[in-house]
């Protein structure tokens, strides 16, 4: 009888009661020791590992990095299954790689679905290329924006979009898609609105601070017009859930207000000139256009301010802004030549003011 098979010490060691006695028990040689290396595996096995290696070294800066990675892993798992089935006859290797293959195929399908070309309506494609694509708004996000709580409406020539002191500014926000509109105040022309421009961006900015206001201008279709119209309330809720798109709208509305300010100062500004001004952003974007439109009438009792504004802008081809340095303070006297003492510039606040002179 073999000693290692009948010894009670061997049985207790196998059970785990006396592991400290293992050092004195002779251990048979390991039959699985790689004394003779087997032959190299089939070429399919090596190609599968090459696919794994290529997928792992793809740089993350590549645009389609994840798609290429999942594609190489899918190919590698497929080759592993072929090798395990035809050349190795290993059921466990085939099963595990089948699971990995399924996971990679699902993830690859999802990535391809996300990268699918999003079809934008032909009528909205011009607006997307002009306004949103330069700001890197994804097509799927633009489609969500234009596919919910908005509609395309039509106005015939001469029809009114907004009436002065009658139409509420809290209902909608619109972008002109086709045609031309003109804006007037008390029957006097102010400026035009061209395609891919907001119709009521000044009112949208003003209603963020004050609710329940009315249009202070009249907007009439000067041609057959089509425009995209959002519900103001639902658009606000949607932008709150999309911070990126919220900032995009702030920028676009600010730029549109700037263009309208240029148009107010130059009524001859046409669509081609307006396009050249799109890149010129200034502090005017922070001014409420509603206040700008109202400022042309300094008093509700007379139209002197309006006529003065119209006379000043009829022949104006560029902006003329008075320098703030030309405004004299009420507490300052004119500085005469040769005045060297700063105390002579300002009037004394009171006759009892004590002057302190520095000793030489």
UniProtKB/Swiss-Prot annotation:
Keywords: cAMP, cAMP-binding, Cell adhesion, Cell junction, Cell membrane, Developmental protein, Glycoprotein, Limb-girdle muscular dystrophy, Membrane, Nucleotide-binding, Phosphoprotein, Tight junction, Transmembrane, Transmembrane helix. This is Popeye domain-containing protein 1. Homodimer. Homodimerization requires the C-terminus cytoplasmic region. Interacts (via the C-terminus cytoplasmic tail) with TJP1. Interacts (via the C-terminus cytoplasmic tail) with ARHGEF25/GEFT (via the DH domain). Interacts (via the C-terminus cytoplasmic tail) with VAMP3. Interacts with KCNK2; the interaction enhances KCNK2 surface expression and is inhibited by cAMP. Interacts with CAV3. Belongs to the popeye family. Cell adhesion molecule involved in the establishment and/or maintenance of cell integrity. Involved in the formation and regulation of the tight junction (TJ) paracellular permeability barrier in epithelial cells. Plays a role in VAMP3-mediated vesicular transport and recycling of different receptor molecules through its interaction with VAMP3. Plays a role in the regulation of cell shape and movement by modulating the Rho-family GTPase activity through its interaction with ARHGEF25/GEFT. Induces primordial adhesive contact and aggregation of epithelial cells in a Ca(2+)-independent manner. Residues 93-115 are annotated as: Required for interaction with CAV3. Gene3D superfamilies: Jelly Rolls (2.60.120.10). Residues 70, 114-360 are cytoplasmic. The gene is POPDC1. It is a multi-pass membrane protein. The chain crosses the membrane at residues 49-69, 71-91, 93-113. It is found in: Lateral cell membrane; Cell junction, Tight junction; Membrane; Cell membrane, Sarcolemma.
